A protein has these predicted regions:
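A charged, aromatic-enriched C-terminal amphipathic alpha-helix characteristic of glycosyltransferases
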Residues: 17, 315-348
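Donor nucleotide-sugar binding/catalytic pocket of nucleotide-sugar-dependent glycosyltransferases
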Residues: 126-165
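A short helix/loop element that forms part of the nucleotide-sugar donor recognition site in Leloir-type
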Residues: 163-178, 320
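A conserved mid-protein helix/loop that constitutes part of the nucleotide-sugar donor-binding site
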Residues: 19-27, 182-205, 218-224
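Conserved acidic donor-binding segment of nucleotide-sugar-dependent glycosyltransferases
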Residues: 292-303, 312-317
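Aromatic "clamp/platform" in nucleotide-sugar-dependent glycosyltransferases that forms part
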Residues: 241, 260
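Short His-centered aromatic/hydrophobic patch
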Residues: 72-78, 97-100
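Short hydrophobic beta-strand element within catalytic cores of glycosyltransferases
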Residues: 277-280, 287
């Protein structure tokens, strides 16, 4: 197909999940010869895009007619499209939905604020021509409230740089903490729904394991308190936030994701790309994307079973090869590009 002009709209240049997904897509589009520009609202973060980036406000007028595709991520960019999309326009508008809105908003903000936030989100994507979910499960979730003909799904990818290493200081700190034990690791934005307390409870049953937590977030102090309550604080290392946290995967024996809810965890894809053994909660998104030969899953709220599954994963060397092969076959940057360009192409034929 001919080369496209594509505008992406994101909240900021912060290195959070939706903006990283957008960056990964821009990288692939440019690599395949398409022209991209990224519009953003907030002057914060230092995510680098391989194209022009332009700061805007809700009052800024973008000439949408110059683009084939306008692709937004998150509520404010979606609202911008809702307000500024012309009544008649050849340009096609795409939104990527990054979460299970009511489930996640209710967990984060409570019933009242979560309900209002859900209504605002659903309103914000009203005028988009195609709404892209992150999985089949998410598409089924939204098919009850949105026009299923306007829904699609594309699995995320990750562009990882295997040459990046960690600082000598961090490496020495982690190895000194690990000693002769096995190291469980995770990296994430630290929220209550990430369910890290379950690993703390399992750790009390695993004397030869240590737990490395990389990241920051609004619930960090709560999570540290849970760690102390489980009396395992001497076996948990809170390293803090680190850029490109996947650099630390080679130091981990097992990567753990005990989340209660996930859209499509980029961290799991990074672990898969590195061929790291993964132990995950048995939520639908994980079971859809990886099978029992690629990851080990455990039921939520059962620390005893989590402890058993960690020991099982440690003994299964084939998990490393299997999960890496699955990433290369199904979640590679090329597969990500192919799926999105197919959606763009179909829209432009309408």
């Amino acid at each position: 197909m001919h080369h496209l002009n594509i505008a992406f709209i994101i909240p900021s240049l912060k290195a959070n999940g939706p903006c990283i997904v957008c960056r990964d897509l821009v990288v692939q589009m440019i690599a395949h010869g398409h022209h991209c520009i990224v519009y953003y609202f907030d002057e914060c973060g230092n995510l680098v895009f391989p194209c022009e980036t332009v700061r805007i406000t809700m009052k800024t007028m973008i000439d949408f007619e110059q683009f084939d595709i306008v692709h937004s991520h998150e509520v404010r960019p979606n609202l911008y499209v809702l307000l500024h999309k012309p009544l008649k326009c050849h340009t096609k508008f795409v939104v990527t939905i990054h979460n299970y809105v009511w489930r996640d908003y209710r967990s984060t903000y409570g019933v009242l604020k979560g309900g209002v936030g859900t209504l605002i989100f659903l309103l914000s994507i009203l005028r988009h021509d195609k709404k892209v979910c992150l999985s089949k499960d998410m598409m089924a979730y939204y098919s009850h409230i949105l026009n299923s003909k306007r829904l699609a799904y594309v699995y995320n990818t990750r562009n990882v740089d295997f040459k990046l290493g960690v600082t000598k200081e961090d490496e020495q700190s982690i190895l000194g903490f690990k000693k002769d034990n096995y190291l469980i690791g995770t990296f994430c934005r630290i929220l209550k729904r990430k369910n890290l307390c379950l690993v703390f409870r399992a750790l009390s049953l695993l004397p030869h394991y240590r737990f490395l937590v990389i990241g920051d977030g609004p619930d960090l102090e709560l999570v540290k308190m849970q760690c102390r309550e489980c009396q395992v604080e001497d076996r948990v290392l809170f390293l803090g936030a680190r850029k490109e946290a996947y650099r630390y995967l080679p130091l981990m024996d097992i990567f753990a994701i005990p989340s209660q809810s996930e859209g499509f965890p980029l961290a799991l894809l990074e672990a898969a790309a590195f061929g790291t053994k993964c132990v995950c909660s048995d939520i639908d998104i994980f079971k859809e994307c990886f099978n029992d030969n690629e990851i080990v899953t455990f039921p939520l709220a059962h620390p005893e079973q989590l402890a058993c599954k960690i020991v099982e994963a440690q003994s299964r060397e084939e998990l490393k090869t299997n999960i890496k092969e699955k990433f290369n076959d199904s979640y590679s940057p090329q597969a990500f590009y192919d799926d999105y360009i197919a959606i763009y192409s179909d829209l432009l034929k309408e």
